[in-house]
Amino acid sequence: MVYYNHKAIENKWQKFWEDNHTFKTGTASSKPKFYALDMFPYPSGAGLHVGHPEGYTATDILSRFKRAQGYNVLHPMGWDAFGLPAEQYAMDTGHDPADFTAQNIATFKRQIKSLGFSYDWDREINTTDPNYYKWTQWIFTKLYEKGLAYEAEVPVNWVEELGTAIANEEVLPDGTSERGGYPVVRKPMRQWMLKITAYAERLLEDLEDLDWPESIKDMQRNWIGKSTGANVTFKVKDTDEEFTVFTTRPDTLFGATYAVLAPEHDLVDIITTAGQAQAVADYKHQASLKSDLARTDLAKEKTGVWTGAYAINPVNGKEIPIWIADYVLASYGTGAIMAVPAHDERDWEFAKQFNLDIIPVLEGGNVAEAAYTDDGLHINSGFLNGLDKAAAIDKMVTWLETEGVGNKKVTYRLRDWLFSRQRYWGEPIPIIHWEDGTSTALPENELPLVLPVTKDIKPSGTGESPLANLTDWLEVTREDGVKGRRETNTMPQWAGSSWYFLRYIDPHNDQKLADEDLLKQWLPVDVYVGGAEHAVLHLLYARFWHKFLYDLGVVPTKEPFQKLFNQGMILGTSYRDHRGALVATDKVEKRDGSFFNIETDEELEQAPAKMSKSLKNVVNPDDVVEQYGADTLRVYEMFMGPLDASIAWSEEGLEGSRKFLDRVYRLITTKEIAAKNNGHLDKVYNEVVKTVTEHLEAMRFNTAISQLMIFVNAANKEEQLFLDYAKGFIQLLAPFAPHLAEELWQFLTQSGQSITYVAWPSYDESKLVEDEIEIVLQIKGKVRAKVVVSKDSSREDLEKIALANDKIQAEVAGKDIVKVIAVPNKLVNIVIK
């Protein structure tokens, strides 16, 4: 049996591609363009696992396919290399995070190159390179100039163990940090914010024009959270104070029986009575220990404290008590709500807990038993009585505006983006704070502001970053003698990844972010492949920065990514005991087809689970490439199932993919290759070309591979293989298994040239038409035989063929034939006595 030597072939062709710059991006503007982008990786110490190449293989297949179709293809790779893990490692070990990051990048790059991806490495970028982050800082200075980057004293999600504040999006539902799983507490701090809220409406509207999964668009819509309603102003009894609430249901104002302020609301300390001061102070402290997510969890027990103060309901003059409760957030809306417990579940539970009034203002339901949250005609509502929801809202908004106690309002759930981190390993923020109280951004000719090299990267202990320890770097003096201090916060990891797709277009430009003509040529990204976990972080931030750059006239498109595709997750094999607890794979042995815990001898259930180091079920692509070859890994990951499905890794599936490639190798190298076409494979070959082409366009890679298998099966049944069909088949294979395809292309052509830019095969529509067709022969409606006949045979010919058939003759012998019914291209039915 002949097998191909994957190590020799893959090493040979990877060297050829590198030596010949095979995948250098074409610049001829006469050709159509195709920009295929991967979400660039964070280069962790663990290196690649087999989940990474799934998305990378998909974009590589599309890139190779499009090159063969005559497109200029931009297919780059780089490194999202700032971030907490490298800094944490450096603090734990005393190593420089830059050195650690460089080692990790070298490992990732070696692994990625071993998989044969057709990246243009001349365009490689690294977010920690000062030549790159010069432009990250430049974008920040432009945001600052336009008032979209500002400082504010805000309650932040502080993580003591990380020594930094993190964004709302980085807090898990259990109130711990996404990175590290550490406790998160609320703490007021001076922070840099980016005014993403200024773009809320455009971020929402422009989703309609994108070819993205609807689930991702919905997640962004929900995160932006547009609400239409009204602001209502409540006066505080016996004071000059007032507060504003936003409500989507101003029509229920007659049912507002109490108000709730966030514990952090500015009014709380002003209006709290002496008798309630201690209870309020204690409650505020407890609230500060909880994350926003923990505070707003619908399932948690309702807590709160009365301030001792009352507000006046503007629509009926009634006094209503003012409470504080942690489920109201200072950062959301106005930090105050009017509570209508008859028609809101959370308000109803709170009112029941603290024995507050519940007044129904909509017909229907029994508010003594539960809140009524459906619609109904208005009751107990003065001038709104008898009106439906829409009419009542309109009438109430008109009344509020006429009386000067409210107005129509659109709000968004989206908060401004907390942009500063109290860490060392990030882009320095290019701002100087002067002793006269002013602040200035560095001019472009002073960028990049380079991150100083230091071993002293432990948190400062003051809430500032370790940069506060570096006096020589920190302190500056202006020409007029005024002293200043550099900003010590650094940018979050999201900064460099919010625009990296633009730098790939012109990565070596030291005069501007990228050349305008090149940006016009390549934008938008045609297909962006990556994980769905980035729906409301990276993807929203990148869209915001892109729209800002569009407003500046830097980029020519409103949106960065035209098509988004989320690949599924490759799951590892895991084992569970009778309690459902996961058991690490090194504690499992297989006996007689079953799996047992080595330590307890308990039989275990096998189940797929996310690959993790703790379960020891992470598959390293290096091992797969060594044993099976890169082409096998590529074909297997694409053949596992639909690209967007999450599927368990299978060694048997890997072996099956390798066997298929060995069959391809044997077919081409051992079958007689004929210069003349005998026509036997016309139909199957043309069908395969047509179908594979369609499935590649639709990113249905698993079914495209199935078609390749169909051709191999059909070709193996023939004595010889027509040369043009052999070559065409290898071209179809090339995007999936490029090393083997290059080797077999040379075997067939002896050209000495790569297959990369050979024109994609076409198919002959006329060859897809069936010349012959199978019909059934029946006696009294029951099938007795099947025969292949010429397509569109006449009734007379079909009758003759049926009566000449051996099986039919045996059945009708000695019997009278009453009639013969022939239906062209379908059947012949013989009726006998």
Swiss-Prot record:
Annotated catalysed reactions: tRNA(Leu) + L-leucine + ATP = L-leucyl-tRNA(Leu) + AMP + diphosphate
- Single GO term (MF): aminoacyl-tRNA deacylase activity
Which cysteines are cross-linked by disulfides?
A: none
Q: What is its main location?
A: cytoplasm
Q: Family assignment?
A: Belongs to the class-I aminoacyl-tRNA synthetase family.
Q: Which compartments is it annotated to reside in?
A: Cytoplasm
* Taxonomic lineage: Bacteria, Bacillati, Bacillota, Bacilli, Lactobacillales
Task: Please give the Gene3D superfamilies that the UniProt record associates with this protein.
Answer: HUPs, Isoleucyl-tRNA Synthetase, Domain 1
Where along the sequence does the record place the motif called 'KMSKS' region? 610-614
UniProt motif 'HIGH' region: location: 41-52
Extent of the signal sequence: none
Per the UniProt record, which EC number(s) apply here?
6.1.1.4
What HAMAP family does the annotation carry?
A: Leu_tRNA_synth_B
| Segments forming a coiled coil | none
Q: Which UniProt keywords apply?
A: Aminoacyl-tRNA synthetase, ATP-binding, Cytoplasm, Ligase, Nucleotide-binding, Protein biosynthesis
Q: Which InterPro entries match?
A: aa-tRNA-synth_I_CS, aa-tRNA-synth_Ia, Leu-tRNA-ligase, Leu_tRNA-synth_edit, M/V/L/I-tRNA-synth_anticd-bd, Methionyl/Leucyl_tRNA_Synth, Rossmann-like_a/b/a_fold, tRNAsynth_Ia_anticodon-bd
Query: Gene Ontology terms, cellular component aspect?
Result: cytosol
Has UniProt tagged this entry with the keyword Electron transport?
Answer: no
Q: What class of enzyme is it?
A: ligase
Q: Which residues does ATP bind?
A: 613
* Protein name stated in the entry: Leucine--tRNA ligase
Q: Which GO terms describe its biological process?
A: leucyl-tRNA aminoacylation
